[in-house]
Amino acid sequence: MDGNQPAYLFDFLGVDISRCIKDEIINGWILLSRKITLYLDPQTGQVLKTWQNPWSGETLNVMHRSYDYQEFEIPQQIKAHIAPEISSVSLDINLKLPNPLAKNPKFSEHSPEEFIQSSDSYKFIFPTKMLSDETLTPADNRAVALSYYRMGPWEPWMKMKGKPGFLVLNYTGTKTDAFEELHPEIKAQIQQRMPLFYEAPTHRLQRSIATSWSRFDEQFDGYLRGEEFPLPAPVAEEV
């Protein structure tokens, strides 16, 4: 950014609670999910409540990511590398979309850019036998590993005031079907404040997909008040 060296800003901790459903209308599969991502202090590993912007010096409320509904239409054809023992499938998503916050003056210091441009790359790595073994159990999901790499714009809560630059995120993870195997911080959030996130959505909803920008718009007043994020998510009927 502005000729500066890359800066190590955060570590991350997260969970993606998801399920696939068959959609007869498109004759394909839809991935439905809820997602939590917590920002961690890279030195201590503690969940951040506030963050000091190293360029502006401002201390800001941290808006951890919580998306209660997302959906993704799984392509009919997916890039795959099939090997005798270990195989992988890859998904690459490149987007350039209008920024819904850009024209609102109250967000001018948070997200003034005209477009949101990002590149996301997912890779799932698994034993090749999972493609043909009909005796697999849910416990076998633990053998699936995930790699996720993203280049995208600053998060609105970082209040970068339109300065040039971007975030590079690099995640690794594993698949599990057991709630008890989640990180204690994630479990505590779900048990104490976000019971809606115990399960993935069961069907497609008639609503827009959550993003950092839509959430910032919806929760901006709470952000200014210094409320604790992610905000509570009680169980609710979804239509």
Set out the residue ranges of the language-model regions.
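Long intrinsically disordered, low-complexity regulatory regions enriched in proline and serine/threonine
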Residues: 180, 191-199
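Intrinsically disordered, low-complexity regulatory segments enriched
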Residues: 56, 60, 159-162, 218
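Predominantly extracellular/secreted and cell-surface proteins with exposed
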Residues: 3-141
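N-terminal segment immediately downstream of the Sec signal-peptide cleavage site
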Residues: 1-43, 173-177, 184, 188, ...
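Extended soluble regions of mature proteins
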Residues: 116-174, 180-185
